[in-house]
Amino acid sequence: MEELNTIKLSDHLTPFLTFNRQQWAELRKSVPLKLTEQDLKPLLGFNEELSLEEVSTIYLPLARLINYYIEENLRRQTVLKRFLSGHNPKVPYIISIAGSVSVGKSTSARILQSLLANWPVARKVDLITTDGFLYPLEILQKKNLLQKKGFPISYDTQRLIRFLADIKSGKKNVKAPIYSHLTYDIIPNQFDIVDRPDILILEGLNVLQIGTNKSNQMFVSDFVDFSIFVDAEEDQLKEWYIKRFLKFCRSAFTDPNSYFKHYANLSEQEAIETASQIWDNINGLNLKQNILPTRERANLILKKGENHKVELVKLRK
């Protein structure tokens, strides 16, 4: 445990404590891993291989930490309930997970959801992606924003904020729009229903975003209790994106209903060049302009290396 006491000499100069894999894994303590290989498989992303060792090394200590925060939050709610003579509705604990396209946010969110839902203290854990709050394709086309899809301007932010405000106010059966990656559009008249969960995990590119022009404006981050940023070097992110694009060309894009069916007939070299251009002109640009600048606002940063393995964990003091 001596290593933990001397985490990094430079830590006192930053708002974060930095842990390597071994140091972070020690913080799991005696928490058992109930997840099996069979349970893990449906949680993984399309292009990800992630082992149970990664879950026990990285995600179990994280789930343990979050549970401490949740318990503290519940104690605070109990105090408020006493003060208000019992007239205080249950307030869900909101966790946000941000990061670039292809970094593995969705997988991290699903694993965390599974661990938190199966913790010794039974809790209802819902997961919502901000993709459902993108403007419909028709509106993006009218506004000439297709090349900015995923940028903050392409989201109906006010609708997302109303959704989060309803969740935080304890409202029942709150509707969240559903996005289809097949049709590249919002599915009309279909919704996920969020009914007063104990925990809501909100996953998306720009959930840590704040503005600079309106000081009184509300942001998604105003409703978040604990924020996570999944990080990796850009060359690694681009490589993962191209690899995923190639797999999609041989699978999802071959569906006649796919918005991207025109990519299905590309040669491998053409697919690599197309994916590289999309990254450079859209995803990489969004990363540099909008996503990376929000990283330091997170409560916790998971820094990935090769094979989607987390190499460093940075925890806000």
Curated annotation (Swiss-Prot):
Belongs to the prokaryotic pantothenate kinase family. The gene is coaA. It is an enzyme of class 2 (transferase). The keyword Kinase applies. Pathway: Cofactor biosynthesis; coenzyme A biosynthesis; CoA from (R)-pantothenate: step 1/5. It catalyses: (R)-pantothenate + ATP = (R)-4'-phosphopantothenate + ADP + H(+). One of its GO terms (cellular component) is cytoplasm. NCBIfam families: panK_bact (TIGR00554). GO terms for biological process: coenzyme A biosynthetic process. This is Pantothenate kinase. Keywords: ATP-binding, Coenzyme A biosynthesis, Cytoplasm, Kinase, Nucleotide-binding, Transferase. ATP binds at residues 99-106. One of its GO terms (molecular function) is ATP binding. Its EC number is 2.7.1.33. It holds the Pfam family PRK. It comes from the Bacteria. It is found in: Cytoplasm.
